[in-house]
Amino acid sequence: MSFHDRAETLLVRAILGGFGALSPVAASNLGGRIMRAIGPLMPSNRVAIDNLRHALPELSAAEHRRIARQAWENLGRVLAELVHLPGILQQTASGPGLELVCSDLITAALQAQPPAIFFSAHLANWEILIPQGIRMGGRMGGIYRAPQRSGVDGLLTRLRHIAAGRAFPLFPKGGKGGRDAFAHLRGGGKLAVLMDQKLNEGISVPFFDRPAMTAPASAKFALHFRCPLVPVHIERLGPARYRMIAEPYVEPPASGDTERDVMIVTARINQIIEGWVRARPGEWLWMHRRWPSE
């Protein structure tokens, strides 16, 4: 591990330790306030405003700035809540906790013999999906974008394992990760994928009426294994409080034209995610370069 890797890991550990010393609500509020203040000053805020301008042109510039501030605040809350995930995953009537909607759809997919693919997006607190699926009895793994610093990657992975109550496989995006995810599904495992990030090697399908390079692996896996794609998204109800919602499965077509079927399934996934984002735009990660630069 390099000096910079060790230094950054120690810094992240110290920050998370500070949040861990607070209550879940206090940590969430503090993280949100910090990022709401500094996020709009960061270069990636220009990406967020540009994305909003193209995706939601019917809104005013002031509304775009407001949504961008909300997105920064949500990101700060997500980071601060990482150390409090075990408590957040408790099903409570109020305060920190999680509400489940249509959980029978999740349970059925987790308990079914064939593999299943759960897709979601960077909405509200996306770190909830896999740990909650494991707590519900699923043998889940996930595809993720690994941080550049291996020490930070290991630290975040340990926090995710603590939230789930046990270790689970995470497959870095890329060729080897894709092959390992395929093997996990072939062995009867379940896979969670966040489908809203740009993949330069992906396929171009519409997202907010603009071509967006999108990973086709989930569609290809579903077609290969003839397994359902389960839409699941998270909504923020307050500091450290969430609702996880499952929707009817996306069943893979069987036209015999694999390339066409992959396009159809991937476009449907983007359409579903777009609906989630339009409903709660302040909870999405607008500062990501989702579309090609113009």
Roles of regions detected by a PLM:
Residues F3-H4, E58, R65-R69, A108-Q111, ...:
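Non-catalytic C-terminal accessory region of glycerolipid acyltransferases
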Residues A112-G174, N200-V205, R236:
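Catalytic core of membrane glycerolipid acyltransferases/transacylases, capturing the structured
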Residues A14, V47, D104, I128, ...:
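Short Gly/charged-rich anion-binding patches and loops
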Residues P96-E99, L123, R149, F171-G175, ...:
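A conditional alpha-helix N-cap/helix-loop micro-motif detector
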Residues V101-S103, I143-R145, F171-G175, E247-Y249, ...:
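Conserved beta-strand termini and adjacent loop/short-helix elements that scaffold enzyme active sites
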Residues T92-L98, R166-K173, F207-D209, S255:
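Short, flexible loop segments at the rims of nucleotide/cofactor-binding pockets, characterized by
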Residues M1-S120, T157-L159:
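Membrane-anchoring hydrophobic helices of lipid-metabolizing enzymes
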Residues R46, S103-D104, L123, A146, ...:
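Alpha-helix N-cap/helix-start capping motif
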